[in-house]
Structures are given as C-alpha cells and as structure tokens.
C-alpha cells in the first residue's frame, strides 16, 4: 500500500510503471511530483514547454523526483534555467531524461544577461523619471524662468553658425544620461521634420507630393497633419519650448495679449475651471449673437448677458448692430469663439494694438474731450451757463498752473549799488516774486509771466476769449481784469455801445458778470472805490489800442493806490500773512527790508529788535540758535573773531554780518570797533 501514498519515495523505484488511466491521463495511479503524461492538454504544455523536455524514449511516461533532487542537492550542472539537450542532466533512473526547469529553485548567482539588461533598463528609466521631474520643477521656478528668458533673448540674436557652436559647447558638459536623453529628443525631432523624408534614399514617387506639402508647411511655420511630434519639439503646435529662436518674442506678445483690461477669447481647453472669467459683453457688443449661437452648441453653463442699463451709448440697438457688423470694436473678440471671458486666449494678428495692420487710434484711450476743435464759437445758451463759464474763467485767472508755495520774496539774494531812496523789491528787474521772468516796464510783480496785450499766458481760459473780452480794450492783464471789480457795477457799463466792434449783447453781459465776480473777490480794495476813474474811456470800441493804453493807466493808478493802502503783496498761501513792502518794518527781501543790507538808510529798529526775523531777512536764519540769548545791541559790536567764537565758521556769512553791523552802527551813531573800516559801504580802496 506504500505505492499508493502521496509522499514520494526516497529513491527511485525499480518496479515497473503503473498503467495509465486512459479516461484521465493526468490522473496517475501512483502519485508523484512529475509532470502529467500528456503535455499538450494540461500541465506545462500550455506554457510553451513542449515535449522536447521529456525523454524521447518515453515521452508519455511520468517521472519520479527523489527527495534529494527535490531539495536541490542534485548535480549543479542540471540547475541551469535554460533547457538543456538530451542526456545533459542527471538521470534518476535508467530511463529518465532531463527535467523541466520549473522544478528547480534557482540560486542567487543564476542571472541571465537578459535579466541584467532589464534591471539596467529599469534603473535608467527611474533616473530619467527623476530627471524629468526635476526639469518640470525647475521650469516652474520664477528665477530660473527669468534667467532662461534672458538666455533665449541672447540666443535669438545669434547667427546659425553661432547657435550651432553654442549648442556644441554646451553639449560637452552632458552626462551619459543626458546624452541618451538628447539622442531620443533629436531622433524624435528628426522624425517630425519634413525634410528628413525629402532627404531619405527610399523616397518614391508616390509620396513626393506629400513631402512637398510638408516642406511648404514647415516653411510657413505650420505643422503637417501627418507629421508626428509632441509638445516641446519642432513641428508641434506649441511654441513654448526653451531656446527657440522666436520664443522670447512670442512670450512678450502673449503677455501683451493677455491683458485683463480687455475681454478675451477662451477656448474650452484653455479655460480655468472657475467661473470668475465668465463675463459676457453687453447685448450690443459686436459678435455677441454669433458667440451666443456658438455657446448653444456647448453644454457648459453660460452666464447671462449684461443688462441694458450698462449700455451707455444712447443709440438704438439697430444702429449699434449695424456698426458692429461694419467693423469690430475689440481686437480680442472673434465670431467663432465658444465663449468670451477674461483669461488666456490664442494669439491672433489683432491681439496687440501694435500689430502691422492696426491703426494708431487703437494705441491710446479715447479722450473725454475731443482733440480737434471745429473752430466754431458757440454762444452760451442761458444766463446760468454764462455765469458758470465766468466762474471757471475767474478760477483759472486766480489760480495759475503752479502749486503756490512759500513766499519767494524772502529768499531773494540782496544786491547793493542802488541809489538812495531807489530801493525796490525786485532788485534784478528780471524776476517777479514767483520766480518768473517779467518785463519791469510793462508788467507788475505777481502777474503771470510773458503776458502780451490781449493774451492770458499759461493760465488763460478759452471761455474768456470766447466771449471776445479783447474787444473791451482791457487786454490780457489779470490786474486789469481785477480792476473791473473796483465798484464797476452794471451801471458803470452804460456807455458801452454793443453794436460796435463786434461787441454783442452776450459779450457785454459776459463782461458785466466777470466784473461782478471780480468785485466780490477784490472787496479788500474798497478804499479805492471813491477814487476810481471811469471805465468808459477804456471801453472805446473805435480802437483797441486806446483801450489798452487806458488799461495801462488803470494799472498804474491801481498800483499807486495799492502801495498806499495795501503795502506789500499777498502771499500765494492764504494761511500766511502778507509780505512786507519796501521800507516797512518786516521787510522780507534783504535790500530795502530794513535789515541794513543796502546801506545805513536801510536800517529799521523794529526789524532789529526781532533778532530771529532780522536773521531771516538777512537770509542767515540758519544761525538763529547762535544768537538766541543776544540782542541787536550786542550783536552789532561783534568782530570777526567774536563771530568765530560764536560758532559762525563760514567766511561769507561773517563778512555779511560785519557789513550789516557797520551799517547799523552808522545809522545808530555807535562807535565802530577798531579794524572795521574795511566793511564800510562803497568801493574798496586799493592798497
């Protein structure tokens, strides 16, 4: 009964083989670890291991496996994983052949060259994957992208020979893995290049036409539909690969194209998944009907169009529709696009206003005020419009086109050499108190610079000129315009003949309204009302020159009265007090300011008593902390050495102090310290 047990024998049995069950050849009468008798129906026949592995003498006989062989203690020559020939293995009996390789347990030393090649290939694949991941991570780095863009800009300006030399030099630093990567990339690029088919020796007449078509497409920077290729290689639809000749320019054009300030065109694959860009133009936007028809074929939800309240054009919908059909308004809107939004769109010739076929008018925004006037003077519609226009003109006259700062008079450098009693605030005669070049014979300080008769200069309002105020004979002097408000009410214009010199009733009314405005603003000149001359001689419409001469007379009379009643000029800053006039106690201009710069006559005791103000008039206020505990009596007795001991190290400042001190001592009859005669006013005596 031992022959029917499932455990194999320790040694091959010398007894004859049991009979084979014909109904089931795989079911043996005596169980063993050997393969079934029929290898074609079941067992190893399905694995492709044919009957050649069995003994040719008995192909259908089962074989026994001893325990020693099953434990791997057989001959080492029989442990090869490759099937060996007949009689190459150790036979367990006189009739046994080589056993199949699946019965052996291979050791660690048994490795085939194919397995080693596969392992090496997997190692390279893992290395390539890591390299590609690092390349993808580096391409997202902003610093690397900027540096690479600079390299691309430099690469674009090189010639073909220089590009080839540069690439060849860079390839010398490649690692073996990079070399294999470059080989694969270049092989792929050569396959997608249509010129490779043209230069191939196996070119036949059947594909000659296709080759010519691909060559033409490549010259036009288009990709052939039959050519292979992926993203990043030559011939592909994407032009974003690195070190491309036109990549830098394409990126710059794309950056200009993808502006958020204009509605863009988005394809479905270019959209973000969010709904922030689903902004549709108003109903009268050009191309909206075609866009909505294109949207009806899409399953994506479409936002509602803008309401009619956003249409600020004021035109009927039919006229806007005709205008939109005539020419497109937006360069980014295309009729075939499935959606309109704010985002990244495809490049188009009209994407940028700086294209070859774009108009210069699209390079700037539409101005709110028209640039070209037709030259027609439109009369005011009502008295309210006239009053508003006059208010604007008055505002521009009183507020010139510069920012009023501190009083510029106190920063003027004093100059000597004037005759006694001839001191003036404008010493040089070339600049007024605002630092503007003026003519001292015709223009008073404080008036706009460069004013000619019947002109306003930089601050002139076209509204005043529109009403023809030049015909009033008042010229362009803002001071003369101010004189209109010196109690020249509506009754004062009774002598004006509106029918002469083109002076219409509307223009006369404009002059009256302007006079009323000026009267309200110049109310501080009320003492001048009683002595105001009549304006009627200045409004003689026969000659404009006579009116201008009368305006000069009015200016002179007004300036004389201003020196009597309103000494000094008004500071452009309303929060500051008026600057003093010549000869006043708080003069602000060195010569003539009472500080003693111009001579002994230019000394005012009230100015000297306020030491900080005295130093400010002398433009030496930076030394105010040096004289905090001093009065003018002690200061005028100082010598050059005393000033140095007091902390005044600048030679120019000490000289100016000593000259002023000499004038003050002369005015106050104070004895001069010894050695101070050199600071006396007048020409220096040559030694």
Swiss-Prot record:
SUPFAM superfamilies: SAM/Pointed domain. SMART domains: SAM. It is found in: Cytoplasm, Cytosol; Cytoplasm, P-body. Residues 606-667 form the SAM domain. Residues 1-115, 248-341, 526-598 are annotated as: Disordered. GO terms for biological process: nuclear-transcribed mRNA poly(A) tail shortening; regulation of translation. PROSITE patterns: SAM_DOMAIN (PS50105). Residues 52-68, 550-566 have a biased composition (Low complexity). It comes from the Eukaryota. It holds the Pfam family Vts1. Residues 29-41, 287-301, 526-539 have a biased composition (Polar residues). InterPro entries: SAM (IPR001660), SAM/pointed_sf (IPR013761), SMAUG/VTS1_RNA-bind (IPR050897), VTS1_SAM (IPR037635). Residues 1-10 have a biased composition (Basic residues). GO terms for cellular component: cytosol; P-body. RNA-binding protein involved in post-transcriptional regulation through transcript degradation. Monomer. Binds to RNA. This is RNA-binding protein VTS1. It comes from Cryptococcus neoformans var. grubii serotype A (strain H99 / ATCC 208821 / CBS 10515 / FGSC 9487) (Filobasidiella neoformans var. grubii).
